[in-house]
């Protein structure tokens, strides 16, 4: 389990981060996530990938005098889940049917995954960085030729060539 989804949910700039700040400006999104996990029955250990002193101090503060979530706070978490679900995303299931027909051998589900992360978590810069490290230049979204072979194979009827253009605008410039 990754309660902060590799740090994406802890982003103060995301819709969830802004909502949590409106509920309690003194508590970080990461703290909310860790308190939720620690309040679950049967949890014995929680690992946190921390990248700076602030995160270490925030985690220590969260667990120093730990209090499980209250019913009201579970309502706050439920609202966070709804905020994430309400974000319009490309409904890709990563079935990979689209890749078989792609003459450019694009990793279409991977590109869509990165694109969706920018929509869901307000993580454009980090997604762009990881995209450029994980997707080789010769198979990036900008290499889509718009043939739509992929769209014929997609059981979700996603307009993949349009999404590749949008992803290219976000990541390949």
List each language-model region with its residue ranges.
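Structured C-terminal cap/extension of enzyme domains
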Residues: 2-173
């Amino acid at each position: 389990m990754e309660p902060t989804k590799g740090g994406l949910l802890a982003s103060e700039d995301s819709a969830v981060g802004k909502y949590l700040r409106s509920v309690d400006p003194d508590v970080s999104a990461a703290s909310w996530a860790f308190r939720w996990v620690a309040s679950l029955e049967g949890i014995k250990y929680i690992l946190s990938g921390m990248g700076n002193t602030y995160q270490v101090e925030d985690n220590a503060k969260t667990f120093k005098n730990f209090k499980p979530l209250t019913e009201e706070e579970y309502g706050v978490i439920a609202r966070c889940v709804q905020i994430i679900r309400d974000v319009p995303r490309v409904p890709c299931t990563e079935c990979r049917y689209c890749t078989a027909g792609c003459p450019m051998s694009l990793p279409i589900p991977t590109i869509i995954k990165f694109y969706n992360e920018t929509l869901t978590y307000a993580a454009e810069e980090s997604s762009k960085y990881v995209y450029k490290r994980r997707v080789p230049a010769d198979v990036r979204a900008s290499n889509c030729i718009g043939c739509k072979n992929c769209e014929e194979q997609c059981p979700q009827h996603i307009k993949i060539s349009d999404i590749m253009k949008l992803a290219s605008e976000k990541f390949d410039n």
